[in-house]
């Protein structure tokens, strides 16, 4: 009998603890930040694979990242970082038109976003719009950052 009562008390405490946890919102991601972080990690891994010329494996990771980032975007449409990586993943999977849309949307939120300006510039180089790429470079001018250096080098190669 004592064992049954102990079990019932344990069960009641467990249920209350679980309800309190759920009610507090702990473990829930209302902003999409964990989806964003997962997507960003996948992109970082994919970039490393790309450097090793493992293009198909990289593309698979970009597609997985895209899935996470689209879900993050559904939860937080005003986050320039999400828009940056969403545009990046789309560009890397060949959807330049949609990538450009998200980059431009991100610039409306943060016109000086270093990543968006660099990656949008790269998109413009990839789509033979060098004048527009140079505009992005001009925005980055003076930042003394790798984004400027990388975009400048890419423009000079083309």
Regions found by a protein language model. Name each.
Residues 79, 113, 145-148:
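Residue-level recognition of tetratricopeptide repeat
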């Amino acid at each position: 009998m004592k064992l049954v009562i102990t079990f019932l008390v344990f069960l009641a405490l467990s249920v209350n603890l679980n309800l309190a946890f759920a009610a507090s919102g702990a473990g829930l991601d209302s902003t999409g930040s964990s989806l964003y972080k997962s997507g960003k990690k996948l992109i970082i891994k994919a970039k490393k694979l790309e450097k090793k010329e493992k293009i198909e494996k990289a593309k698979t990771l970009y597609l997985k990242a895209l899935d996470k980032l689209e879900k993050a975007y559904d939860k937080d449409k005003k986050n320039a970082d999400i828009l940056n990586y969403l545009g990046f993943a789309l560009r890397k999977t060949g959807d330049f038109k949609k990538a450009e849309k998200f980059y431009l949307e991100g610039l409306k939120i943060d016109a000086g976003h270093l990543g968006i300006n660099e990656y949008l510039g790269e998109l413009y180089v990839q789509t033979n719009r060098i004048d527009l790429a140079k505009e992005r470079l001009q925005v980055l001018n003076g930042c003394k950052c790798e984004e400027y250096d990388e975009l400048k080098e890419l423009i000079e190669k083309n």
